Every structure is written in structure tokens, then in C-alpha cells.
Curated annotation (Swiss-Prot):
This is Fructose-bisphosphate aldolase. The keyword Zinc applies. The keyword S-adenosyl-L-methionine does not apply. Its EC number is 4.1.2.13. It comes from Nostoc sp. (strain PCC 7120 / SAG 25.82 / UTEX 2576).
């Protein structure tokens, strides 16, 4: 099966009531781990790369790694997604490099640091939608800024994240604005701000509704029942992996991620894409530290890279099962980008709100 657009997977997930983890990648071992887990669980795959990941791996290397995954696992539908595009040009370059889905994050200006106005966000996102949909490529937008409801601070990821602190009005997606944004931009998926942030240090305590607003997802889904919602910064930060890292020389302080059961609540309320990166980074780091500590004379990189694949594969397989993704890859049929482009042109995939549907 060739690379497929994100919309194909999210539509299937919505029809069948499950979510799909979207795993960030920048090297061979990560891609191998994800695809091994997907094959093990019969799960569709969303691979995503940030601007930093594309620079690190190199465009040609990354593109061919993804094509190798498609060739090796022809039975698995795979999406290649641009994560947090800071400007239309970033999204267009991703499309030129065979990405089948892009995120135009207009919640921040092009410097990826300054919170943007609603009007700016709508304009740049709509610009990308017009170009991408003409090619059958899916588009994710974002409304609200990712950051902590405890501190008001964000966590930059590959240079993407606001500086300073924001208030709750900026850190929580407004349901009314969400309706206006989706109708004005026609995005395929909407990333919402509910108190999650990038990195391992998301919460200082086990999150409750006060600092993790799953109820905001429920309200947005009520207003936009046919819009695919996205949770960013949704690693669960497993305690056992942190303990293993620290056992072998790490110094990660106590921290809390997004509990799986809270993500499952979100999936029941329209969340179809769940972004995960930190959990896999922790798995790789734990494996490498353990392997090096147990055999300090070893200098063959394969000695510690092989365990990193195994540890990350375990995390990915667990998320596929926990989110209900498992068992669905074989049920999804190939649909070309050209077919999706025709559907967009005919208005068959237009986004509408619950209120508009009643008119």
C-alpha cells in the first residue's frame, strides 16, 4: 500500500470509535520500532516529523526511510505527517517531499514563539488548506497554545513553543472559536489546547480536571461532532522507564504525563490522533543506558541500538492496543491522493458544525 492521506485513517477511526497514536520519527530505529509494533498489532500508522527532525535526518534520508517502511510493510496504511509547520512554506516543502499530511500551526507566528491572533491563524491555515487539498493532502490546524495550566508556561519542542507565560484564555481552546475556525479553514483535523505540553515535564502532580481539561474536548466535540480532534503533548511518561533511566545514571526528576485513561476519555469524545514522542524517547534512553552499563566494554552501536528498538516497540504496541487502533490496519482500503483531491473539489469532505447541520 502506498502512503495514504491522514484523512483516510481519521475517517476510519471516527467510524469505528478508536484513536491513532502519531509517533515522531527522525531515525531508522524509531521507524523500525513503530512498524514492528504496527505489524504485531495490525495497526495503521501515523509517522510524523518536526522541522527539527527533517533537518536532523536530512530530507532525502528521511523520505527514503519512509519509503522503505512502505515497501517492507505493504499491508499497513502509513501516513507521513509534518508536525507543527510554522509557516505555509514549511508545509509546502513537506508536500514536495511526499508528505501526505501537514500541520499548519498558526497558533504561533512564523517565528514559532509569538502567540498569533485568531485572524492570522485562520488566514495562514486556510492558505495551506487551499493548496494541500488541491493535491489530496490532509491538513491539521491548531487553535490555542500548548502549555501548562499550572504554570502558564510552555515547553519548546525543536524550537517551537511560546516564550514566557500565558493565561488560561490562551491555553484553552475556546469552543465558539473552534467552530468558526473549522468552518473558515476547512481543516481535516483540529489540535486543541487543554493543558498538555511538549516534553517530559508536563505536570507536577497526577493531573486532574483543574490542570488537564478533558471536559473542553467534550464541549468542542459536542459543537463539532464531525471534526477529528487531536491531542498534542500526550505522552504518559511511564514511571518504570524513568526509574530505569535513573538506575543507570540518569537524573530525571519526578514528573507526570497524561494518563492513558484520560486519553481514552478523549477518544470517546472525538479525539482521533494522539501525538506521542517523549514516551519513545524515554524507552530508547532507558535501553541505551541499561545496555551500556551492563556491558561497558561493548563499543558496537548495534549492541545498544537493538534493545532501543525492542523497548520502543513495546511502548508503541501498548498504545495501539490502549487506543483501540489494533486490528484495524487490514480493514482500511487504499484511497489515492487524487481521489481525495476530487472529493475536496466537489465539497464532499466539507467540515460543518452541529449548528450549521441543523439549518
Amino acid at each position: 500500500m502506498a502512503l495514504v492521506p491522514l484523512r483516510l485513517l481519521l475517517d476510519h477511526a471516527a467510524e469505528n470509535g478508536y484513536g491513532i497514536p502519531a509517533f515522531n520519527v527522525n531515525n531508522l530505529e524509531q521507524i523500525q520500532a513503530i512498524l514492528k509494533a504496527a505489524a504485531e498489532t495490525d495497526s495503521p500508522v501515523i509517522l510524523q516529523a518536526s522541522r527539527g527532525a527533517r533537518n536532523y535526518a536530512g530530507e532525502n534520508f528521511l523520505r527514503h526511510l519512509i519509503l522503505a517502511a512502505v515497501e517492507t510493510y505493504p499491508e499497513i496504511p502509513i501516513v507521513m505527517h509534518q508536525d507543527h509547520g510554522n509557516a505555509p512554506s514549511t508545509c509546502y516543502s513537506a508536500i514536495k517531499n511526499n508528505f501526505t499530511s501537514v500541520m499548519m500551526d498558526g497558533s504561533l507566528e512564523a517565528d514559532a514563539k509569538t502567540p498569533a491572533s485568531f485572524e492570522y491563524n485562520v488566514n495562514v491555515t486556510r492558505e495551506v488548506v487551499n493548496v494541500a487539498h488541491a493535491l489530496g493532502v490532509s491538513v491539521e490546524g491548531e487553535l490555542g497554545c500548548l502549555g501548562s495550566l499550572e504554570t502558564g508556561a510552555g515547553e519548546a519542542e525543536d524550537g517551537h513553543g511560546f516564550e514566557g507565560t500565558l493565561d488560561h484564555s490562551q491555553l484553552l481552546t475556546d469552543p465558539d472559536e473552534a467552530v468558526n475556525f473549522v468552518e473558515a479553514t476547512q481543516v481535516d483535523a483540529l489540535a486543541v489546547a487543554i493543558g498538555t505540553s511538549h516534553g517530559a515535564y508536563k505536570f507536577t502532580r497526577k493531573p486532574t480536571g483543574e490542570i488537564l481539561a478533558i471536559s473542553r474536548i467534550e464541549e468542542i466535540h459536542r459543537r463539532l461532532p464531525n471534526t477529528h480532534l487531536v491531542m498534542h503533548g500526550s505522552s504518559s511518561v511511564p514511571e518504570d522507564l524513568i526509574a530505569l533511566i535513573n538506575e543507570y545514571g540518569g537524573a530525571i526528576p519526578e514528573t507526570y504525563g497524561v494518563p492513558v485513561e484520560e486519553i481514552q476519555k478523549g477518544i470517546k469524545s472525538g479525539v482521533r490522533k494522539v501525538n506521542i514522542d517523549t514516551d519513545n524517547r524515554l524507552a530508547i534512553t532507558a535501553a541505551v543506558r541499561e545496555a551500556l552499563a551492563k556491558n561497558p566494554k561493548e563499543f558496537d552501536p548495534r549492541h545498544f541500538l537493538k534493545p532501543s528498538i525492542t523497548y520502543m516497540q513495546k511502548v508503541c504496541a501498548e498504545r495501539y492496543v490502549q487506543f483501540g487502533t489494533a486490528g484495524n490496519a487490514s480493514k482500511i482500503k487504499q484511497v489515492s491522493l487524487e481521489t481525495f483531491a476530487a472529493k475536496y473539489a466537489k465539497g464532499e469532505l466539507n467540515a460543518i458544525s452541529k449548528a450549521a447541520a441543523k439549518v
